[in-house]
Swiss-Prot record:
SUPFAM superfamilies reported for this sequence: CoA-transferase family III (CaiB/BaiF)
Active site residues per record: 175
Protein name: Succinyl-CoA--L-malate CoA-transferase beta subunit
Its job: Involved in the 3-hydroxypropionate cycle used for autotrophic carbon dioxide fixation. Catalyzes the transfer of CoA moiety from succinyl-CoA to L-malate to yield L-malyl-CoA. It is highly specific for succinyl-CoA as the CoA donor, however it can accept L-citramalate instead of L-malate as the CoA acceptor.
Comment on pH dependence: Optimum pH is 6.5.
EC number: 2.8.3.22
Amino acid sequence: MDGTTTTLPLAGIRVIDAATVIAAPFCATLLGEFGADVLKVEHPIGGDALRRFGTPTARGDTLTWLSESRNKRSVTLNLQHPEGARVFKELIAHSDVLCENFRPGTLEKWGLGWDVLSKINPRLIMLRVTGYGQTGPYRDRPGFARIAHAVGGIAYLAGMPKGTPVTPGSTTLADYMTGLYGCIGVLLALRHREQTGRGQYIDAALYESVFRCSDELVPAYGMYRKVRERHGSHYNEFACPHGHFQTKDGKWVAISCATDKLFARLANAMGRPELASSSVYGDQKVRLAHASDVNEIVRDWCSSLTRAEVLERCYATATPAAPLNDIADFFGDRHVHARRNLVAIDAEDLGETLIMPNVVPKLSETPGSIRSLGPKLGEHTEEVLKEILGMCDEQINDLRSKRVI
């Protein structure tokens, strides 16, 4: 196994993933799905903490690890040991991208900072992910996704009005968002390198990824000092109805009428076309001014029907509506299967088939692929050291005796 394939757009690109958990490693995972050879560099004792996050497997790791660390080769290496740092530098010399998420100054303390690595490999692209970035007064503070949600403002907006702020969907949302932004940064840096021959480093902060997805929060506050509050299951600043409604069978649907035309469709779906007349609620401004009344009408209608019945009538009139899916709903959705959003991969050492999210986005000519599940700790150490650095068994055994690998 050489970790790459010539039919994918990033074939020939080698990535060192020396990060842990999700954010920076997710960037490496995305690159690996499209052909990059990803070397997962881990500490010999325990490896990446993600191996212990989530549902345990018989192999001693977790389902999270198997899914999120796909298409990677595991190489154990103690970067704090001088010999480990030396081997790491040799790998850097033969690589294109480094993904890391150590606290600022940690790699520098080990003699592996950007100033050192960029001299070894001037073409290197280095993604540095932290909670607050490499600069600024908060740079040394520890940061995780939940902290980023708080600092970036998204947690403040999640929850019922005047109630306790809640987790905005996923506790790891900021990690995935930052991994995506980091991946964009790496691809841009690769393009720049094509033009100039020079690498660069990318400074990605978790809270900034969250903050960037804040629509008009910034200009609204900058111009009018307007602070958006929690709206619960209905967000009626720009559109009404625009929220979640419970159905007769205890399930939920989302309905969004961003225009008057869409509200007219909903009114027809409810069998009450008169609601969309100009003298009632046909104008968005009127609906917004009477949002509680409009929402009550829609709420009463939804509660009189099952979810399937509500959706059937909405779909028949082209009203934007959808079920609030739990994971079981998603597995049973015919559109999900038609789009192949789920993929089954044989986990041979577990004797089972693992179902996981498929690769996105879908490229027409060079689609990504899942070629392997998250590796065992150190599974490819010897393979990589021999293949890339040309080490012999004696050299590898020496590193092992020193607990470098």
